[in-house]
Amino acid sequence: MTRFPLRRAERAMPRDEALAVLDAAEFAIVSTVDDDGMPYGVPLSFVRRGDTLYFHATNEGGHKTVDFRRDDRVCATAVTGVEAFFEDGDFSTSFRSAITFGRVREVVEATEFKHALVDLCMKYVPEAKRSIGKAMEKEGPHTSVWAIDIEEISGKAHPGPRGDASGDGRTDAADDGGCAGTDAGRQTDPVAGAYPVAALGGEGA
């Protein structure tokens, strides 16, 4: 892959801040290339754990999963803190963005599969954690989980007139390996990390 230097080098972000953008983002655009060379990008809800991004799909498959199985190279892009402004006679936009490159794979190991779905639910609907187990029992057989193992990541930020391009403020998520806002109800698993016991149908469910 050809790499180009960042034109505005002063806007580059360190790795931990780029990861924080991923954690704060509501969705990412995951891009592939069709078998005829046409680029294809699809917005997906996702969650990060460490250097891996997880998202789900149906077992029926579709455009993106056909591309995944043909070529596992993908790019995922996320943006937060977007705000247009006019200052000193110029129009501009504040933002924080992250671009990742990696390899996509289908998650087939049971523990990783379960934890990925729990983390996704806890990112987007943490208030419903006690219902996750039942939902997984119902929808799990019809669901596939995919993972992007990050090989490269870069970030870029343009502060607005207030000097702030931090998105929604969840920038501390990178410190705990992702899954922002999912600490409540966790129990540590020495193999696969932390997860809400109640969501898996264990004690307290």
What are these regions (language model features)?
Residues M1-I29:
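Short, basic/aromatic recognition patches
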Residues R15, A20-E26, D34-D35, T52, ...:
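Hydrophobic/basic alpha-helical segments enriched in Actinobacteria
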Residues L19, T65, D88-D90, A135-K138:
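A generic local secondary-structure boundary/capping motif
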Residues A25-E60, A76-T77, F86-D90:
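Short beta-strand segments
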Residues I29-D34, F86-D88, V104-E109, R130-M136:
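Short helix-to-loop capping/linker segments positioned immediately adjacent to catalytic or ligand/cofactor-binding
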Residues T52, R73, R103, E152-S154:
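Structural motif
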Residues E60-D119:
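Short, structured beta-strand-loop surface elements
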Residues V108-A205:
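C-terminal edge-of-domain segments
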